[in-house]
């Protein structure tokens, strides 16, 4: 089964670029769409995307089937992989905690489940009209699955594709100039403006893909590439509020990996404001305390160690937080 869907990535991406409009292909350039043998005699629904308009009844059907049969199931499988990785994770509170409470070295071992996510995502794209509202979600899930398998080059391909294919466009299909004041854009903006309101629907996933691209860079310690994108998003007024917690997370992660403890703690503390009061939040508060302690700021370290105590449902974490708070208080 895996041999079927790995080659399909190129076909689906090339097909999407061809269908999107005149900015996607050069004049006179014919795009070939090689299919795996199992699909050679079949015209996929995605290949019929350009055949006529997708009217409201058809779009409702495409959205419903793609969402509940494919996007929902792929998301559930992906969450299960992460949950299992978290369940086997064990922290040593006597040392600096890892940034995440799971490891990619663990998630990559769950390759069968992640391959199933990739299969669900690629099938959901191939078997449905590309103009439905969930195609970008499926491309994103596909990329995340590759990231969790530590197939960073393949993940990069998907995230970059989302960034390109779903970039802002003019009515005639041509790209707006991103990061420039031309075409009515803001010169400092690279993010996609998201619709707001009750009827806005599922937000476009291009902005999410930018965050995952940063995570992908940082997993490979490609700090220069991550820094350029981070700096652009930090000052981008268009970047949505719903992803500010994620942005603060990857900024903190970047500083953490470079052992810039004070800055890592500052942005981790900002990230905490968007997290529910759970044991995971308590763990991150403890980590923030550790980072401030490493930076020599014992007052801030005590504050976050103390915050972790009432939020923790883990007795060991609660005890270690109390001990750490007493330790830095005495050091002060």
Predicted regions and their residues:
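Bacterial N-terminal signal peptides that target proteins for export
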Residues: 2-12
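Bacterial N-terminal signal peptides
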Residues: 10-20
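Acidic, polar-rich low-complexity tracts and alpha-helical solenoid repeat scaffolds
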Residues: 25-332
């Amino acid at each position: 089964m895996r041999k079927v869907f790995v080659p399909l990535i190129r076909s689906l991406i090339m097909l999407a670029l061809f269908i999107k409009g005149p900015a996607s292909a050069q004049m006179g350039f014919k795009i070939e769409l090689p299919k795996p043998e199992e699909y050679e005699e079949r015209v996929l629904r995605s290949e019929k995307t350009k055949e006529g308009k997708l009217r409201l009844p058809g779009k409702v059907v495409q959205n419903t089937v793609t969402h509940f049969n494919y996007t929902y199931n792929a998301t559930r499988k992906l969450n299960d992989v992460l949950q299992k990785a978290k369940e086997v994770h064990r922290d040593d509170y006597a040392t600096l905690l890892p940034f995440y409470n799971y490891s990619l070295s663990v998630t990559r071992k769950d390759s069968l489940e992640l391959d199933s996510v990739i299969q669900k995502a690629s099938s959901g794209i191939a078997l449905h009209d590309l103009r439905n509202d969930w195609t970008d979600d499926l491309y994103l899930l596909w990329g995340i699955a590759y990231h969790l398998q530590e197939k960073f080059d393949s993940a990069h391909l998907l995230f970059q594709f989302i960034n390109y294919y779903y970039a802002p466009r003019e009515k005639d299909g041509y790209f707006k100039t991103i990061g420039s004041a031309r075409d009515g854009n803001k010169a400092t903006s690279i993010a996609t403006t998201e619709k707001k309101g009750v009827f806005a629907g599922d937000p476009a996933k291009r902005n999410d893909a930018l965050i995952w691209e940063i995570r992908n860079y940082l997993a490979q310690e490609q700090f220069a590439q991550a820094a350029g994108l981070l700096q652009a998003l930090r000052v981008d007024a268009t970047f949505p509020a719903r992803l500010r917690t994620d942005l603060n997370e990857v900024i903190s992660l970047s500083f953490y990996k470079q052992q810039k403890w004070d800055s890592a703690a500052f942005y981790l503390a900002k990230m905490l404001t968007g997290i529910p009061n759970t044991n995971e939040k308590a763990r991150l508060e403890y980590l923030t305390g550790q980072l401030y302690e490493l930076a020599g700021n014992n007052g801030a370290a005590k504050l976050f160690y103390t915050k972790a105590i009432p939020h923790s449902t883990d007795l060991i974490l609660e005890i270690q937080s109390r001990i750490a708070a007493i330790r830095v208080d005495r050091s002060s």
